[in-house]
Amino acid sequence: MVRVSRGCQSCVDAKLQSTPSPSPSKSPSPTESPEQCLQKRQSGEQVVLPSRPFPRTSPRAEYRPVPLLALDGYINPSLTVTAVNSQQAQVFTNYVLASFPCFFRCTETRVPVNWVEYVDQRGSSMNSCFDWAVRACTSAYLGSLHDDQRYLVASRSLYHRALRGLGNLLSSEKTAKSDEVLASAIVLAIFEKHNCSSPDAWLRHAAGIRTLMKLRGPKAHLEGFGRAMYIVYRNFLITAALVEGEACFLEEPEWQALNEEIAASDAKLPTSSLYTDVVERGFLSVIKIPGLVKRTRELQCLSSKKRAEVQPALLQDVQATRAGLRGIYTEFGVAVSMLRSGQDENDTFVGPVPNFFFEGYSSLFARGVRLGLLILNYLIVIMDPKQRATIDSENFMLLNDMTRSQRSTHPALEFKLPLTPPKSPGRPGLVVRSLITEETREPPTTDWMDRITSTMGLEAVHVSLVG
């Protein structure tokens, strides 16, 4: 019990619950009513309130809950933060290995800081735009993994919170150039591909990331975590360029130079091989495809006279790119065979990369090269119909190879020969359809993102030639 000082009428009226006092003075009689206690108080006599509340029949009684503090947070406020952060890093690692298994394991040694290391190194940073974006992805992953709608609802809330935080950071050019802003934008873009909140939302994300990369400049993506961000998202930029009908800005000389510097840097690594060099050169060829598609479409809109002037140079560029990609395909097969040579079937590792991931990544990259050759063949048919018979035969072999190695979970999207009959009237035209839609999207527990990135973005589009 605590002693109530003179003049504290409101305390008496409220009849607050009190805590025991180490030196109580005078206890009231159990038979005394509240009115009798009040009369003693007014006469100047000390009144000691009981340590328990008055009976519930009193209309003036008031009870207030006392908030409880978590013991860990009370003793050391950082304990809870550290525990949550540790769990978050582990869940993010599981998410990356589920969504990007082959691509991550085959590229993690090519970057100074990979994505898992970056998340782990951030320590107890939990109230930032990037961390909200990461938690949005991991919550969606857990919701899909355990079929729990609570996680999915929470992930959307975190997604919108991260978007607002990203908007605040973009208000300053200095912060807009930071690694955290680009990393947040990339994580949110990946989240959007899995959720498809609107048909073109992922394209808006891609446009924003393209702007951020240009603002930062190529050199910002050569070292540190910048390289990891660039390597993982550059493939989606090819997808976006094809869907939008535009050339990919990575084809520009300064960005081509960046890719060449990355390839040269990779060649100096202890884990480097002909395999990684061929992969980089294959990417350099594929980034030209969106620009060639755009130029071919523009060619079809020209008059016959103007078309006759422009077409030879364009056809030569397409054929040169196709020849280069064919060479890459052959070299890649040789490089893979060299790495496999001397390996027993039961061996766990092929070089520094586990056999499972190596085989998966090799298969997907080869598929991406075939898809690139298929698109280039379509462009040649549009400009030079005389090559139709030869190209039909080659396309049949390419599609047959891809059907045998088909990994897509969408049977309805199996590849067919989408060529117009050779004698059909009218000009054939190229149709590019996005496969990042509400109907074709896959959850983050699948390797859908892995298939897109490892095929250099070409797995996310369906290209056909129609008349």
From Swiss-Prot:
Domain of life assignment = Eukaryota
Region entry Disordered: which residue ranges?
Answer: 1-60
**Which Pfam family, just one, is annotated for this protein?**
Fungal_trans_2
**Expression triggers:** Up-regulated when grown with elevated levels of potassium chloride.
Keyword vocabulary terms for this entry:
Stress response
* Function noted in UniProt: Involved in osmoadaptation.
Q: What is this protein called?
A: Uncharacterized protein AN5342
Q: Which organism is it from?
A: Emericella nidulans (strain FGSC A4 / ATCC 38163 / CBS 112.46 / NRRL 194 / M139) (Aspergillus nidulans)
